[in-house]
Amino acid sequence: MIKIYDTMTRSLRDFVPLTENIVNMYVCGPTVYNYIHIGNARSTVAFDTIRRYFEYRGYTVNYISNFTDVDDKIIKAANEAGISTKELSDKFIAAFMKDTAQLGIKPATQNPRVINYMDEIIAFVSTLIDKGFAYVAEGDVYFRVAKSNNYAKLANKTLEDLEIGASGRTDAETDRKENPLDFALWKAAKEGEISWESPWGPGRPGWHIECSVMATEILGDTIDIHGGGADLEFPHHTNEIAQSEAKTGKTFANYWMHNGFVNVDNEKMSKSLGNFVTVHDMLKTVDGQVLRFFLATQQYRKPINFTEKAIHDAEVNLKYLKNTHSLPLTEEVSQAELQTYLDAFQEAMDDDFNTANGVTVLFDMAKWINSGNYDQTVKAAFEKMLQVFGIVFEEEVLDEDIEKLIEERQTARANKDFATADRIRDELAAQGIKLLDTKDGVRWTRD
């Protein structure tokens, strides 16, 4: 059985879906005001890998990942560029889809956009006001955190702790609130900002309400898994839980999953340190499959360190797997031996999607394959395991001239003309084709 580390309970829990063999997942997507950075990519790859493993285990996955296209950062960037917020969002949504395609990300079941859910957002906020969980203040609408049961439990905090931290705050917005911790569900319109009409006057939604509405509209009041980066535990996911459960009276998500951060050369990635790396720029020099492999093979909850050496190692390891995949098939292999690798892989991945252990099994299997165990059944199993990591290798097709040289070398060896055989071997090596003579015949890899 698959076990998931649930952030809410801080424990490993058996995964039991609401509906048998179906997984409903909502993963917070990017705010589309710029190209995604390597930290965004880490989250996208981590949850794509988790989705792929669920599918490997036979589940049908409804995978929802949103685009936040109404936000302070988008408004600021659009104003600076002299274009509409929609034009800016459209540009960076297209860039996101292009970049993530190069990372081997499967298309989501749906990618909802905030601008398409404005009526539903207004209705959601109205319900919270009617139930006494929200109040209007000068055109803004705030959520009453004091009415929320176990507020901030997800972040392992108490309301009392947070109130102590918030004491002494004073600004125009705080003065409008009943409690400094109350958060905005709806923001009154400001000059030069996009807005929509509402019962409280023109304005736009707060950040947290957007995900609650899109998740529940598409997947229902309770979902199986809600995921995102560790930075979203508080306040974003905390506030999603508070407002969603206040509206429905039901558990919002049964499992909460959060991926770890990305450091660059052992330092936190930030613009101020000058180590901020976008995927758009990275893909100019690094193959998307290599970057994917680096990100996918680290255990998703742990921080990872992005370095040139780490990328080089990923490239070397991926090349080894590719060469293994391209080996010619052998005679029938012991299915019992194959099963030991399949069982070990499942055991690793069932343990909270431990890709670090899973990829170790993959390399053990590759070593076994290279020792002459590669029939069609083994190849199919190897490919399915690779696909969990988002890796798909195209079949290598040798040029006719190279195939002819290999055949000529085989003939020369059969005739004990070893000088000719060695000459052809050297000629092939110069073209990047490495030959290996085995009991099952000649095998080749491309350097």
How should each PLM-predicted stretch be described?
Residues 97-119, 233, 288-290, 295-296, ...:
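Non-catalytic interaction-recognition regions
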